[in-house]
Amino acid sequence: MSASTETHHASEAAVPTAPRPRPGLGTKNGRLHQVPHIAGLILGVFSVLVFLWSISPVLRYYVHVPREYVDTYYFDAPDTSLSWALVVALLAAALASRKRIAWWLLTIYLVLFLITNVIVSITDKNVNAMAAAVVQVVLIGILIAARPEFYTRVRRGAGWKALGVLIVGLAIGTLLGWGLVELFPGTLPQNERFLWALNRVTALAAADNEQFTGRPHGFVNTLLGLFGAIALLAAVITLFRAQRSHNALTGNDESALRGLLLQYGADDSLGYFATRRDKAVVFAPSGKAAITYRVELGVCLASGDPIGDPEAWPHAIEEWQALASQYGWATAVMGASETGATAYNKAGLTVLQLGDEAILRTREFNLSGRDMRQVRQAVTRVRRQGVTVRIRRHRDVPAEEMAETIRLADAWRDTETERGFSMALGRLGDRLDGDCLLVEAVAEDGEIDGILSLVPWGPTGVSLDLMRRKPTSPNGVVELMVSELATTSDQFGITKVSLNFAVFRSVFEEGSRIGAGPILRIWRSILVFFSRWWQLEALYRSNVKYQPEWVPRFLCFEDNRELLRVGFASAVAEGFVTLPRFGRSGTRDALEHTGTHAAVPAALVAAEGLHSDGSAPGEGLAPTATGPKRPEQVRVRLDKLAGLAEQGIDPYPVAYPPSHTVTEAVESPEGTTVRIAGRLLRIRDYGGVVFAVVRDWSGDIQILVDEARVGTDRIRAFAAEFDLGDLVEVAGVIGYSRRGALSLLANEWRMTGKCLHPLPDKWKGLSDPETRVRQRYVDLAINSDARRLLEARSAVVKSLRDSLGGRGFLEVETPILQQVHGGANAAPFLTHINAYNLDLYLRIAPELYLKRLCVAGMEKVFEIGRVFRNEGVDFKHNPEFTILEAYEAHSDYEKMMVLCRELIQTAAIAAYGREIIMRPGPDGALVEVDISGEWPVKTMHQAVAEKLGVDVSPETPLTELQRLCDEHEIPYQSTWDAGAVAQEMYEHLVEDYTEFPTFYTNFPTSMSPLTRPHPTIPGVAAKWDLVAWGVELGTAYSELTDPVDQRNRLTEQSMLAAGGDEEAMELDEDFLQALEHAMPPTGGLGMGVDRVVMLITGGSIRETLAFPLAKPRQ
């Protein structure tokens, strides 16, 4: 995308004056507010009538009487005058646009007519004149009352210019008309021909036809009226045309914009183009947001989103609309993002998708693959010709080389003027643009074959500003530069590149597809036709080859009736249409600051943070964020932190290990000297003595600071220096208080960490569950129960590991990133590796890799590790959790049952010293449950039958199972087989209501794709599930080792996955190939470690995790 250097001046600057009226305000009286529109409508209808009877003799005949009445008493209504029809029409449009000069003209005109009617009514006793005078008094009164509603300005000096245009135009028209009358006089006498031409062209047909003794040919009257209409049209347009913004950026304006971009520009790919210096700018009153714009054809055209703080966008938009309303400009926006378009839409603008911006994500960009074949071939072809790419920041390019780059960019431009407005900077080589990137294609002989210049897009992106290639350079130079930029972008910290904006991208893409409708094809054909001049399709084709991400961009405008004018104004601004300019030069300089009136709020200028040369504000002087708003207690602690620093006290010192833990200190004999460290939980100051409570992970101890031991100054310093929550080190001797409480009698202390936030209520702690999860560190610091749960978890995990190790199992680690998700029926998380441009899954189970190790000969192997399943979150589910999987050769699922029970019982001993678990009792308090000995074992179908009170077995027909489901309101899908329906019944009737740990065995084969069929019972698999208190704790199989059967089952699973079942497994060819090398008969065990901890401790899954997943902050 190239930048536009050609813009246009206006005669006068559009400089707002305070106070500015807001759109739609004025008197704020609803009826008076509509006066401009009503006046415009009435005069508009009248102008149409004048036009119609001027060209139609029949209509003129029928309206002769009312026309003469209106013409005599109310408003000039000549019988034939196209020029008058045009004048009234322009006056109507100006009134509807609230132009103040139109109000003056209409009011003065009515006043003059009123004076005439008053004189006639007095001298001639004319009742009609008197009635008309009364009506005109009322109309004039309404106009005077509604004067504040006519606030739109026209250009300064427009009246004198319009008068000059009118005089010259009428003189030329009269002379041409006189010549025509002389050529075609008709019955008009010689002495009346000049007057006839003068009357018809300049006198607005004030003299009626009856005052002349003859007539010229009919077509002459039409031409004479046309001459007058042209002159009046030019004059009235000169008079009524809207003020055109002549102002542009000043140095302070650009400096403020750069400050806003530094703070808020990371998400706006077009933001840097706001510094284009031939644009004007309007700021929010706070200076925290701004809109850059240009005025073309009476349209105030903003470019892209507002710059700055999104919270201040509405205020900037309001100021922009007020400015446009003041000068009668229609408002429109080119290239707004979805966020920006939403803000403009809330301000009353209509939004229309204009096209899409092409975004390259450089970490995902790769030349491999079928879709990139065209780019890859072009790059290879150019590289073979010895072309290389050089990429530098503008600030690193020597001045003479930059001058040559500018010369080449001008020489290789294929149009007279540079195109671009919303996505073009309009300058090269400016010292303030040092962060811009220059990409050059360099031929073997050192000549430059192509140039790209890209502007910053936040700290990690760039946006294409200028693209040039040497006419004789080989095809593919641009592809080489873009691909090299994308593949080497990490050297410049670039992760995203914004390429050209493709107008109507979806039309080109969808209109060329098979099956596109006729309307879409016609629309595409029209765009292709205009692409001969405006390169619409070429921009799309040049971008789509890179497989970019398409981000929609929008056109915003006030009124559908203005859409054509807005579109034409946009074409003018972007350089697609060049209009002739008269008077002053039509160009505005995009290289220098030509603005004469700074738009930046005076408060920002007064802060002396802005630079008149346009550079970004200095550090600390720009309107930068001050961080989060701090509560008062935090501010007090921050002040105390600063005070400590001023006193030379380091609130975060280097380590000095304590001599004892708190528990060790408490157990030490009286008089023992100790040094402990922990968090200060309580302070009680009694003047001469201060009591405090310090806690480390092992326990709490009371600290006693006695004035008699340390002195008055030091005891005061202790009370003043520390706050609750601070980390402290205290040294002293173990002793007792006067009331006999064991205490550490402090001699020395120091702060090891200043806590900047107050602790929660010392009795209630963190009562909100979400806060407890989000601030887990606080909960653990003050909540002993939470600490005991984590201790129990650690004991359980260590016990599981030690128990398996003691049985001869080897612990291994298998990949977490996997190319195929398998080993369980669950929805996976998807991620992407940039190095190989490959989609990967976070594992849902380690099973298939552990079985590969079984094939390799590891007879006893286990893993304890994290797995990830994209499922719901509740008291027993977390998206990531810890699993234990163990495999033993020459074993089966029955031996795994014994192993599982013993592992859990041993873990309970590690946590509590006995084979007990904790469960909530009726009152919510935890009670002990003995889990020693054997646990119940039932088949799945037997458990379902007991709940239903009817016989259910693996042979029960599907229709009977469906009938039972309907009877007990158990949902199922019509496509499920009998095994799936039976398992659904088990989950609803059995699993949810099981309490004491129970093994359920022999599940349907169709629901166990990795399990060996039961050796004696057809239709079921050698599998069990362990359930306790409604939670599935683990499962075990006699593993399926037949590779042919396993391939068939996984193929069925992959077909389900292809059909949309996201929980079905994919076909893992590598695993099947390993299985084909033979795996011994194996028993496999899988157990949820988090759920085992839940079972033993009686907590929820969130309580047993150090950091469970928390909801996003609102």
Swiss-Prot record:
UniProt main location, coarse: membrane
Name of protein: Lysylphosphatidylglycerol biosynthesis bifunctional protein LysX
SUPFAM superfamilies in alphabetical order: Class II aaRS and biotin synthetases (SSF55681), Nucleic acid-binding proteins (SSF50249)
Family (UniProt): In the N-terminal section; belongs to the LPG synthetase family. In the C-terminal section; belongs to the class-II aminoacyl-tRNA synthetase family.
Binding site for Mg(2+) 2: E1032
Gene Ontology biological-process entries: lipid metabolic process; lysyl-tRNA aminoacylation; response to antibiotic
Residues reported to bind Mg(2+) 1: D1025, E1032
PROSITE patterns linked: AA_TRNA_LIGASE_II
Membrane topology: Multi-pass membrane protein
Function summary: Catalyzes the production of L-lysyl-tRNA(Lys)transfer and the transfer of a lysyl group from L-lysyl-tRNA(Lys) to membrane-bound phosphatidylglycerol (PG), which produces lysylphosphatidylglycerol (LPG), one of the components of the bacterial membrane with a positive net charge. LPG synthesis contributes to the resistance to cationic antimicrobial peptides (CAMPs) and likely protects M.tuberculosis against the CAMPs produced by competiting microorganisms (bacteriocins).
Gene name of this polypeptide: lysX
Cofactor remark from the record: Binds 3 Mg(2+) ions per subunit.
Matching InterPro entries: Aa-tRNA-synt_II, aa-tRNA-synth_II, aa-tRNA-synth_II/BPL/LPL, LPG_synthase_C, Lys-tRNA-ligase_II, Lys-tRNA-ligase_II_N, Lys-tRNA-synth_II_C, NA-bd_OB-fold
Pfam families reported for this sequence: LPG_synthase_C (PF09924), tRNA-synt_2 (PF00152), tRNA-synt_2_TM (PF16995), tRNA_anti-codon (PF01336)
